[in-house]
A protein has these predicted regions:
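Broad hydrophobic/π-residue packing in well-ordered secondary structure
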Residues: 97, 102, 110-114, 147-148, ...
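Thiamine diphosphate
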Residues: 1-178, 185-337
Length: 337
């Protein structure tokens, strides 16, 4: 184990997978130069958040490709390369701009295997950032994972720790289906122990962050640590929680969630997207439909409001679920009569 940041863990996975398989290559806006730096300039960034830094020095510009500012072109080129036998890892800087490449993802990459009767695969990864917390305003702060989770044929990964960032990205690159890989912008600098060498985390297998008896908390990405903070405060009141990080929203580890809710009898789902058609509503529907008789209290969903993400720091702070809101929701369901 080595302590690494979330960003370093992702970079580590890219180095390992590109060394392992010459068909793996990266592409996207400024994935080589970053912030407009010339390729040969020392200290270049490598992508807007520095994840691809250093890759071109080992693998060259044929496998590290800076692309024009065209999300449709990036996603379409990646899908075509995947059909031809390559394993592209494409980067869309912010998930807010995925609308510009929805046809390539929704009608092309997601459908190839089905439309060709299982004879074609599309082993591409589309890395993108999401989430509020950096005062980046409404066009650079959205969380659009529910949008692509709803599309059959796409797999969706959302690591919350450096170890899972490395393990899930390696798994995504080796997968024969298209994977949308969401990286929360506020997590790049967090640190944690990361396995050395090859590390694979299976899709569809949730992580049990902590165990308790009184309530089940389900969250992804940044919201996992918020749940941990809330659980620590709740422990002072004698309330203990299962915290489940699904890791992937598609495929989803339904059994882990349902088994926990059957045990605790209470469920709080935390997601920073707006409430309508959200990850939170999806999990709430799953539990209500499958383990309703085990519930001791109404299911609570802690989400952002049905609103664009505000720019003002104070308003953005109110938009995002907080440990305090989570703690209050758990207290409410535990004390429900």
């Amino acid at each position: 184990m080595t302590e690494k940041t979330y960003r370093e863990a992702l970079t580590d996975a890219l180095f390992l997978e590109m060394r392992r398989d010459e068909n793996v290559f990266i592409m996207g806006e400024d994935v080589v130069g970053g912030t407009g730096s010339p390729h040969a300039e020392p200290g270049f960034v490598g992508g807007v958040f520095g994840v691809t830094g250093g890759l071109h020095e080992e693998f060259g510009l044929e496998r590290c490709i800076d692309m024009p500012i065209s999300e449709a072109g990036i996603a379409g080129t990646a899908a075509g390369a995947a059909l031809a036998g390559k394993r592209p890892v494409a980067e869309i800087m912010f998930c807010d701009f995925m609308g510009l490449c929805l046809d390539q993802l929704m009608n092309q990459a997601a459908k190839f295997r089905y439309m060709f009767g299982g004879k074609a695969t599309c082993p591409m990864v589309l890395r993108t950032t999401y989430g509020a917390g950096m005062n980046a305003a409404s066009q650079h702060s959205q969380s659009l994972h529910p949008l692509v989770t709803a599309i059959p044929g796409l797999k969706v990964a959302m690591p919350s720790t450096p170890a899972d960032a490395k393990g899930l990205l390696s798994t995504a690159i080796r997968d024969d289906d298209p994977v949308i890989f969401f990286e929360h912008k506020t997590l790049y600098t967090i640190s944690g122990d990361v396995p050395d060498g090859e590390h694979l985390v299976p899709f569809g297998k949730a992580r049990m962050v902590s165990e308790g008896d009184d309530c089940t908390l389900v969250a992804t990405g940044r919201m996992v640590s918020f749940c941990e903070n809330a659980a620590q405060a709740l422990a002072d009141d004698g309330i203990t929680c299962d915290i489940i990080d699904p890791r992937t929203t598609s495929p989803l580890d339904e059994d882990a969630i349902l088994d926990s809710v059957e045990k605790t009898g209470r469920l709080v789902v935390v997601d920073e997207t707006p409430p309508r058609c959200s990850f939170a509503s999806d999990i709430a529907d799953l539990a209500a439909g499958e383990v309703f008789s085990s519930l001791k209290a109404p299911i609570k969903q802690i989400t952002g409001p049905h609103s664009p993400v505000p720019f003002a720091k104070e308003l953005e702070g109110e938009f995002v679920p907080s440990p305090t809101k989570i703690r209050d929701a758990v207290s409410e369901v535990v004390n429900f009569k």
